Regions:
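Helix-turn-helix
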Residues: 3-45
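Short, basic, alpha-helical segments at the C-terminal edge of helix-turn-helix-like DNA-binding modules
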Residues: 45-49, 58
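Hydrophobic alpha-helical connector segments
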Residues: 55-95, 146-153
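Amphipathic alpha-helical packing segments from all-alpha helical-bundle domains
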Residues: 77, 111-137, 186-190
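Short alpha-helical scaffolding segments that buttress acidic/His motifs in well-ordered protein cores
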Residues: 86, 100-107, 153-157
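Amphipathic alpha-helical segments used for helix-helix packing
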Residues: 93-116, 164-169
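All-alpha amphipathic helical-bundle segments outside canonical DNA-binding/catalytic cores
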Residues: 117-120, 137-154
Length: 199
């Protein structure tokens, strides 16, 4: 993942990847088929880590949205729970720059795993948040405004993920603290209320 994160798919060679991992070129071919297979395996690892952390709350949220019985207050609570889960995950992984850089590269370069991550992670996540924002606003139908709000809301988390080095430098520390997590959670609640017009 490190080579892809640093050089992108086109810039990373299987020779460099093998040297970095301390394996032979045939080992990559045996386990992954080729460079693209290895690249997709990295994307699956990222998706798996996200699912391990977020699957319970996301699964419950999707079921609540589908039920049609979710109240505005309930939708707001779920939004906050999702944001707090993401804040916790990103702050814990702030030092793992290869994962966030890999994702950033996929977004900017549209590498081979872009469509996979879009289909399995980004699109469903943004649309779920948009649906919850609509319900929390008292609407049954999700609008383009809800989708745009979800995009802007979730993109604010880049300060904790692929931009964490900048954030930590500004905060004058080497890692996020428990106090940072509390403050970020409180701010997330304020952002939700602002998007819902409750601020």
């Amino acid at each position: 993942m490190k080579c892809f994160a640093q050089r992108g798919f086109s810039g990373a060679t299987t020779r460099a990847i093998a040297a970095e991992a301390g394996v032979t070129l045939p080992a990559i071919a045996y386990h992954f088929g080729n460079k693209e297979g290895l690249h997709h395996a990295c994307a699956r690892v990222i998706l798996g880590r996200y699912q391990d952390r977020m699957s319970p709350v996301v699964t419950a949220a999707r079921a609540a949205v589908r039920s049609g019985a979710l109240t505005a207050a309930g939708a707001r609570d779920i939004l906050l729970e999702i944001m707090q889960g993401l804040i916790e995950a990103f702050m814990q992984e702030a030092g793992e720059t290869h994962q966030s850089r890999f994702v950033s590269r996929e977004l900017s370069d549209r590498g081979p795993a872009y469509e996979y991550l879009m289909k399995e992670l980004w699109r469903p996540g943004v649309l779920l948040v948009a649906d919850l924002l609509a319900i929390a606003s008292g609407r049954n139908a999700t609008t383009d405004r809800d989708k745009t709000a979800a995009l802007m809301f979730l993109s604010s988390l880049t300060a904790l993920s692929n931009q964490s080095a900048i954030s930590l430098s500004i905060l004058d520390r080497s890692r996020f603290t428990d106090s940072d997590r509390v403050i970020a959670g409180q701010l997330a609640g304020g952002m939700i209320d602002g998007l819902l017009g409750h601020g």
